[in-house]
């Protein structure tokens, strides 16, 4: 599935995955139209933060990924993404947070295996964020 969805290029060096926090609550509380609006805003935030160094995709439900060319810029882009999200929350108060994970793309590894590693990092991030509250 991922191989068909993602246009993996030789210059892609890292896979970043993002999963929205408590997105079901937004759909259940405010309706699917509000949920769709949140998804559009998140997609726009991703584009603003990452498009210079990668390609952004929605890969299902409330999950997004970025094929990233410049791993050395990853921390900068991640901080920029979270800053943009916080700025957007001022006008769209129901905007959810996003949990984040990344993995370097290994030459002999399938993209599915890379995604599994990125997912494991993302779920660790999600767990740590919940415990910090």
Which residues does each predicted region cover?
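Signal-transmission coiled-coil "S-helix"-like helices
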Residues: 126-129
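Conserved long alpha-helical elements within nucleotide-processing catalytic cores of c-di-GMP signaling
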Residues: 1-14, 21-48, 57-61, 65-66, ...
